[in-house]
Design a protein with these regions (language model features):
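Substrate-binding groove of N-acetylhexosamine-processing glycoside hydrolases
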Residues: 25-27, 33, 280-308, 313-617
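Acidic, His- and aromatic-enriched active-site or binding-groove loops in soluble protein domains
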Residues: 203-208, 245-254, 315-333
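Active-site-proximal loop/turn and secondary-structure-junction residues that shape catalytic pockets
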Residues: 158, 169, 187-189, 226-230, ...
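Disordered, acidic Ser/Thr/Pro-rich linker "stalks" and the adjacent N-terminal cap
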Residues: 557, 581-677, 681-685, 694-697
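Feature activates predominantly on carbohydrate-active enzymes
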Residues: 95-241, 245, 251-255, 287
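Bacterial Sec-dependent N-terminal signal peptides
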Residues: 1-24
């Protein structure tokens, strides 16, 4: 949320009988007592303890209060850490938990007391969140985080965040009581092989130094991660090079470090060697520097489905790794929600609480979708079973804030987490001037579509029952309830209005830039929906044909948008409202055209968009991947992770027809010789012919 400039009016506190339930958005406190009154702040105040207290907290407080500060008169505002003279008489009221704080507001004083410096900073953030139009509720809060480390891991594949986006993120984390930012973008060449051994160039080093500075100002641990596993040599030379790189990062101000061994193959996956290296780093570097936080590692087997039941990878780490080293975990699968059974399973093996790397709203495997829906699905009773909880976001930094805000609330106090209230609060925090429009857009842009991980989210829940009822009735009998028709019409109207209003919004320009292709597609889809409903309502020849031709034109425009925007090399294109709204419109259109053809003996094309070819496979990671067509290419969406292709398994692409071909070009994305399989073709699916392929780089 933005720092609110509060103009303090009047000479004394004024009391009213308004409840705290007045649209206040904050992470749910552990204990909150409200008196049912609101207080208007005076123009004069005294801050007691500002010289001893956390300077970041004092600066944040001064940024909120714009009245006149006095040394002799006005309401007293006590700020400080446990033991400071200014808050000593409140010591027994301050929670003993790390980052805990005590906050009290009444007509005599305001107390902002932390158990430690970060706790004081969080007291200020809650104070800012409680302020509403210059008024505060009269409250007493005792609060602390349920999960020790809470934040974000920039660990996705694809376009890394810009420097300015990261700076905005760090401020957002501090405002929402997140204490961790793990810097590990997969496309940073100095983070991973082969350049992890090299220092950052001057420009990049200066940017990292600025990020560390801003992180510190917002009470966020900037964790720099290295990803050496793909080409590391288990010798003293590479140990020294890794320590040298850490030392260079330390000189830039970094005080928190991580080592990633995820998504690799080969010798780098050896758990014994990994443990030896990490213990060496822990003892020679981390523990040798008193201001460095505990080391974090991401294992190669970072989810249950990838752990070898006959192997001992995880148990080796559990037994060999120093107890202070944190071990990351994504859950039962690469993309999954965290359950009690799942976290008990991993904790038993690694002999410590897992550090959760939650892969949502990351979209690097469904880059044609935006994931703007609510955060749900994680067990709310397992805070003590995990040492940390960080979210892996989308490459769209501003759009990711909807989920990040929600994760901040969940990790702060899971037992009081409210999915829908938090989602709505997140939207109003990010775009208060057009919150209703962003909520409409986000409601219909939350599912991932078919994907190799099989992870799906609810979408368009508010209209889903109506859509199902209308479609069932119309397809079966050509009839429908007017109330359902009107509700669908209103939905398409709201979608169009939301898209137009958001496209011209200047309140959060980085957000609008990120989502603009999807907004255009959203508008086109909504307009298509209205035209299709007109076809349902009136099937007279001239009217129907005008609507039909318009729908066909809109389909072409949507195809153009999909083919020309967001053209990343993995899942290019722009998909919107794909789970409920678009299938609904397509099926209504197809049914309306079919009925028209039957009535008039016509032969209008009822095609919407479709995939004529079919993927068949028994390779677990591949069988659910969507196919794409680009010119004369058929693409299987690439996997970010190492694909495990057992002997005897296959991938089959079944074409819609028999095509003459002079050549075939296959790209597996790997330069290693393809000696592990063969290529076969068949015209009837019964008789197969083996074709010899020549290899050039990654192509066959």
């Amino acid at each position: 949320m933005k720092n609110r400039k509060i103009y303090l009016m009047g000479a004394c506190l004024l009391c009213g009988l308004t409840s705290i339930a007045q649209n206040v958005s904050l992470q749910p406190p552990q204990q909150l007592n409200e008196q049912g009154k609101t207080l208007s702040l005076p123009a004069i105040y005294r801050i007691e303890g500002e010289k001893e207290a956390n300077p970041h907290a004092v600066k944040a407080l001064q940024g909120i209060l714009t009245g006149k500060q006095s040394t002799k008169e006005g309401i007293r505002i006590y700020i400080g850490e446990k033991g400071d003279k200014s808050v000593r008489k409140y010591n027994k009221l301050i929670p003993k938990h790390e980052e805990g704080y005590y906050l009290a507001v009444n007509d005599k004083e305001i107390i902002l007391a932390g158990n430690d410096e970060r706790g004081t900073y969080y007291a200020i953030q809650t104070f800012a969140q409680l302020l509403k139009e210059g008024k505060l509720p009269e409250v007493e809060i005792k609060d602390y985080p349920s999960v020790r480390y809470r934040g974000v891991v920039e660990g996705f594949y694809g376009t890394p965040w810009s420097h300015q986006a990261r700076l905005r993120q760090l401020k957002f984390y501090g405002e929402n009581k997140m204490n961790t930012y793990i810097y590990g973008p997969k496309d940073d060449p100095y983070h991973s092989a082969p350049n992890w051994r090299l220092p950052y160039p001057e420009k990049e080093a200066a940017q990292l130094q600025e990020l560390v500075k801003v992180a510190n100002e917002n009470e966020v641990d900037f964790v720099w991660a290295i990803h050496p596993g793909q080409d590391i040599k288990w010798n003293q030379e590479d140990r020294d090079l890794l320590l040298s790189k850490f030392e260079k990062m330390y000189q830039l101000g970094v005080r928190s470090f991580a080592v990633f061994f995820d998504d690799i193959s080969g010798e780098g996956t050896n758990p014994q060697k990994q443990a030896e290296l990490l213990n060496y780093i822990d003892e020679a570097f981390v523990k040798a520097k008193p201001d460095v936080t505990p080391l974090i590692m991401c294992p190669t087997e970072y989810n249950k489905s990838w752990s070898n039941p006959k192997g001992n990878y995880l148990t080796t780490l559990g037994e060999k790794l120093n107890p202070s080293v944190q071990i990351m975990w994504t859950g039962d699968r690469v993309i999954s929600d965290i359950t009690r059974d799942g976290i008990s399973w991993i904790n038993e093996r690694i002999k410590r609480p897992a550090y959760i790397w939650w892969n949502f709203p990351v979209s690097d495997y469904v880059r044609d979708h935006l994931l703007l829906g609510p955060v749900y699905g994680n067990d709310t009773t397992i805070a003590k079973e995990m040492s940390g909880f960080v979210t892996n976001p989308m490459e769209h930094a501003e759009a990711s804030k909807i989920a990040i805000y929600s994760v901040a609330s969940y990790a702060w106090n899971p037992t009081k987490y409210d999915t829908w209230k938090t989602w709505k609060d997140a939207i109003r925090t990010i775009l208060p001037g057009a919150a209703d429009e962003l909520e409409c857009f986000a409601m219909h842009n939350s599912d991932l579509g078919p994907n190799g991980h099989g992870y799906r989210r609810e979408e368009s829940m508010n209209i889903q029952p109506v859509a199902k009822r209308f479609l069932s009735s119309y397809v079966e009998s050509g009839k429908y309830e007017k109330v359902d028709f009107d509700l669908l019409w209103d939905t398409f109207e709201q979608m169009k209005e939301a898209g137009d209003i958001l496209l011209v919004n200047t309140e959060n320009e980085p957000l609008i830039v990120e989502i603009t292709p999807w907004l255009h597609q959203f508008n086109l889809l909504a307009e298509t929906g209205e035209e299709v409903l007109k076809m349902v309502k009136n099937d007279s020849k001239s009217f129907f044909l005008r609507r039909y031709n318009h729908v066909k034109a809109l389909q072409q425009r949507m195809f153009y948008t999909d083919q020309n925007y967001n053209q990343n090399p993995y899942q290019p294109g722009v998909k919107t409202a794909s789970k409920v709204i678009k299938p609904l419109i397509d099926q209504i259109f197809a049914t309306a055209v079919k009925r028209y053809n039957q009535k008039y003996g016509a032969d209008l094309d009822a095609t919407t968009d479709y995939m004529p070819h079919k993927l068949i496979s028994n390779v677990e990671q591949i069988k659910n991947l969507p196919l794409q067509i680009k010119a004369n290419r058929i693409l299987i969406s690439p996997m970010n992770e190492v694909v495990k292709w057992p002997a005897g398994n296959f991938i089959e692409i079944e074409l819609d027809n028999i095509y003459p071909a002079e050549s075939i070009d296959i790209n597996f994305g790997k330069k290693e010789p393809c000696t592990w399989g063969r290529f076969e073709i068949s015209a009837d699916g019964k008789e197969w012919k083996t074709i010899d392929l020549k290899q050039k780089d990654a192509r066959l």
